[in-house]
Design a protein with these regions (language model features):
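Non-catalytic accessory regions used for complex assembly or targeting
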Residues: 1-4
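Short amphipathic alpha-helical segments and their helix-coil junctions
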Residues: 15-24, 78-97
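Residue-level detector of well-ordered alpha-helical segments, enriched
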Residues: 34, 38, 61, 81, ...
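Core of compact, soluble alpha-helical bundle domains
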Residues: 9-63, 68, 74, 117
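Amphipathic alpha-helical binding modules
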Residues: 88-120
Length: 120
């Protein structure tokens, strides 16, 4: 994914750099292959301002993440653990942080629920 000319970074590479910085600030390891797979899963929405962000203050959005991503894509059964994982990520990224990137959010959910095998 890396471009040899840093002045010509693609939008995805810029997102990747921002994501790495976000994880480093949280003291977490970055797995590029997993990140790339999640970006591919999310498709063009990662480049759309509203769709690229998660609003932890919106219960409908959090329910959609649980149903569509955790239960749908990751194949997990509905349980209190799913809601706990979502809240853990909301708090970990900062409840007052209005720019919780969906890629980071999903990446962290995959990691804490040990579902990396779905993507890599």
């Amino acid at each position: 994914m890396k471009n040899e000319n840093p002045s010509e970074l693609s939008a995805t590479e810029k997102l990747s750099d921002a994501f790495k910085e976000e994880l480093n600030n949280l003291g977490l390891h970055y797995h590029e292959e997993l990140y790339d797979a999640i970006v591919q899963y999310l498709g063009p929405s990662v480049h759309q301002k509203d769709a690229s962000l998660v609003a932890c203050s919106d219960p409908t959005e959090l329910e959609n993440i649980k149903k569509n991503f955790l239960m749908g894509k990751l194949g997990l059964e509905d349980s209190p653990r799913l809601d706990e994982a979502i809240q853990e990520i909301c708090h970990g990224l900062g409840m007052s942080n209005r720019n919780k990137h969906r890629t980071s959010f999903y990446y962290l959910l995959v990691a804490i629920l040990n579902k990396e095998s779905v993507f890599i």
